[in-house]
Regions:
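Short hydrophobic-acidic sequence motifs that mark active-site Asp/Glu residues
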Residues: 3-5, 61, 175
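Conserved small/polar residues in nucleotide/adenosyl-binding loops
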Residues: 196-200
Length: 200
């Protein structure tokens, strides 16, 4: 079975001690690709370095993570825009989306940032990788106007309901990423996976 890790932050400091071993175990387990999203401007260099070491196996993405959206978001977006303009290395825009789990202080800003990055995805013909935490309806509201466009991507680490999964799959070129949460006793994901006929 071929596996693709659509979202990994293995370039972060906490994984530095055994990073090579993690890659070896991933290969042995059948993982053929690892896609790495930065978080914000502070993690771009480390991400690109990791992807350079494992070129052809680890692939870089670029974007502004919703939990990094604050009053300074415009400067962060300028950096993302510059990276997209001057580098052809990036395989996707991500991870992007909305996260209202912690608080809703920057809800409006998160919507603005998401919409901007969705437009870049269309401009540069790149897929998006979406982070969604307690924010499905808000994200769907941003994405819905793009339903008839070539926009494509994946909701990584999807934990939504069967109804929400169905709404995602209304987009002709969107996928849902399922991770270990599906094994939790109280998880409703097995029902969601069954309902949408997803292949794990």
């Amino acid at each position: 079975m071929r596996l693709i890790d659509t979202h990994s932050h293995l370039f972060l400091e906490e994984f530095s001690e055994d990073f090579p071993q993690v890659i070896e175990r991933a290969r042995a387990a059948g993982v053929t690709h690892i896609f790495m999203p930065n978080i914000d401007s502070t993690t771009i260099e480390a991400m690109l370095s990791a992807c350079s070491v494992y070129k052809g196996y680890c692939f870089p993405m670029i974007g502004l993570h919703p939990t990094s959206v604050n009053a300074n978001y415009e400067k962060e977006l300028e950096i993302v825009a510059r990276e997209l303009k001057f580098s052809k290395e990036y395989v996707a825009i991500g991870e992007i989306g909305m996260d209202l789990y912690w608080d809703k202080t920057y809800l409006k800003e998160q919507q603005i940032v998401l919409d901007k990055q969705v437009n870049w995805a269309l401009e540069y013909d790149l897929p998006i990788v979406i982070h969604c935490r307690d924010a499905f309806d808000y994200i769907y509201k941003v994405l819905e106007p793009y339903k008839k466009t070539p926009l494509r991507g994946i909701f990584h680490s999807f934990t939504g309901t069967a109804e929400e999964a169905t709404r995602v799959l209304e987009f002709s070129d969107f996928f849902i990423g399922i991770n270990g949460v599906v094994t939790f006793k109280k998880s409703h994901l097995p029902e969601t996976v069954s309902y949408t006929h997803l292949t794990l």
